[in-house]
Amino acid sequence: MLIYARFAALILTALTLGLSFAHVLEMPAKLAYAPDVYLALQTSLYVSFGSPNVGAFVEPAAILAVVSLGYLVRRRRRALWLTMGSAVCLLLAFPVVFFIFTEPANAFFRVAHLTSLPADFEPYRRQWEYSHAARFVLHAAGFALLALSVLIRPRAAHSELSPFTGGAIQTQRERSYSSPSPSPY
């Protein structure tokens, strides 16, 4: 069960990261476009990113998968902290940054028309682009924390890696027999 939950969380978070990375890669060119070209792109290119298409469901599914994974690893302290850190990053990206910064710009672009471009177009364009850049940073941090939570191994009780046994785990009892006791002199 745990391996499937980890796989789902990684895939969904990677897809979310990919969607936000696409926006960041496009940002330099889009900021240079004329307002009419930019508005045409906004109203045609990003239709599949939003509701009712698949893009709108990937990010909430990633958040649910990561939070569910946190529940499954709740007894593994390091994995739990990393997984919950990932969840916090994803929850900051959506809904916090999205609804405070991105959605107001989306609402502006939904009502703006090419024939009557509003005078306050540029601040909304920058708000939309930079909010997606912020979301990308949060998604990247969330994915990195999630990957670390999957890659770390639980610590064995009272053990450490021994350079003398080829890196095999040595228990505290084995260490006391194999290492010389310090001289009292």
Provide a role label for each language-model segment:
Residues 1-16, 68-93:
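Interfacial segments of alpha-helical transmembrane regions
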Residues 2-64, 107-126, 161-164:
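Interfacial loop at the N-terminal end of multi-pass membrane proteins
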Residues 33-37, 76, 103, 112-113, ...:
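Membrane-interface elements of multi-pass transporters and channels
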Residues 17-27, 67-74, 98-102, 147-157:
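Transmembrane helix-loop junctions and nearby membrane-interface residues
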Residues 110-165:
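A generic hydrophobic-segment detector
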Residues 58-69, 138-143:
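Core segments of transmembrane alpha-helices
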Residues 85-109, 169-185:
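Hydrophobic alpha-helical transmembrane segments of integral membrane proteins
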Residues 69-88, 153-173, 177:
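Cytoplasmic juxtamembrane regions at transmembrane-helix boundaries
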